[in-house]
């Protein structure tokens, strides 16, 4: 088992979980700022947004997790804020981040669809890296399997939990998001019929479908009346993505690739 603590500075312990999240954030900010001028968005506005959105998204991710595990946390109030042990629900962070983005874009007079389109691939790569935090914490894993011989030794050893090998669902989602990120990079440079909002829709459909399938493999899903919450939200995301495509096509939204770029 790998040590979840990356750096120990006296009483201060810096965990791999936190490093994975921060690394994903830094890369996401860099990529978003790089694409921002293409949509006539000031890069400094991206930094301003992150300073507001990131802490609120972390809070939203934790609140979401605590709400659906309230039976446990109501008896362990001191652990509610112990986010270094894991327990950040991605969907809670996404919902909070989307609300903050809408308000921020409105106040800065930025087109919301443009902002979402340049942020979507960055969010996907951040999620891909962030999932490795689950790896170090030995969480977000799946059912038992006989062996994991097809995986590198360090992953196989870390997925040996409670006397059994476990499906590395964190890895499946990380790779799924990485592939989605790569496809978006190709689409937004090559797909000339791509309209404003289509990248956001692709993210919602791609991530929603992948999460719905992978969530079914997990053994630690957040439940609500015997239903997997994330799977229901995944269906909502897929439906929302499809509606965005239909809506933007019908209103003949501007193309993502401008005439000057074609």
Curated annotation (Swiss-Prot):
Pfam families: LGT. Pathway: Protein modification; lipoprotein biosynthesis (diacylglyceryl transfer). It comes from the Bacteria. Keywords: Cell membrane, Membrane, Transferase, Transmembrane, Transmembrane helix. GO terms for cellular component: plasma membrane. It is a multi-pass membrane protein. The keyword Transport does not apply. One of its GO terms (molecular function) is phosphatidylglycerol-prolipoprotein diacylglyceryl transferase activity. The keyword Ribosomal protein does not apply. It is an enzyme of class 2 (transferase). HAMAP family: Lgt (MF_01147). This is Phosphatidylglycerol--prolipoprotein diacylglyceryl transferase. The gene is lgt.
């Amino acid at each position: 088992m790998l040590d979840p603590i990356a750096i120990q500075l006296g009483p201060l312990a810096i965990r791999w979980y936190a490093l994975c999240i921060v690394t994903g954030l830094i890369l996401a900010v860099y990529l978003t700022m790089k694409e921002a001028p293409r949509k006539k968005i000031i890069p400094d506005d991206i930094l301003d947004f992150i300073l507001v959105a990131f802490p609120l998204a972390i809070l939203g991710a934790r609140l979401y997790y605590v709400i659906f595990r309230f039976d446990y946390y109501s008896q362990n109030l001191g652990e509610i804020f112990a986010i270094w042990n894991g327990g950040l629900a991605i969907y809670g962070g996404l919902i909070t981040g989307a609300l903050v983005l809408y308000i921020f874009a409105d106040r800065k007079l930025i087109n919301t669809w443009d902002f979402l389109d340049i942020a979507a691939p960055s969010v996907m790569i951040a999620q891909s890296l962030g999932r490795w935090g689950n790896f170090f914490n030995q969480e977000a894993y799946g059912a038992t399997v006989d062996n994991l011989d097809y995986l590198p030794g360090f992953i196989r050893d870390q997925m040996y939990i409670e006397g059994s090998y476990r499906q590395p669902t964190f890895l499946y989602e990380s790779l799924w998001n990485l592939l989605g990120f790569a496809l978006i990079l190709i689409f937004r440079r090559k797909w000339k019929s791509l309209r404003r909002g289509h990248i956001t829709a692709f993210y919602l459909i791609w991530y929603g479908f992948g999460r719905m399938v992978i969530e079914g493999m997990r053994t630690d899903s957040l439940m609500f009346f015997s239903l997997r919450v994330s799977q229901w939200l995944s269906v909502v995301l897929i439906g929302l993505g499809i509606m965005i495509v239909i809506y933007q096509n019908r209103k003949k939204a501007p193309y993502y690739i401008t005439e000057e770029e074609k």
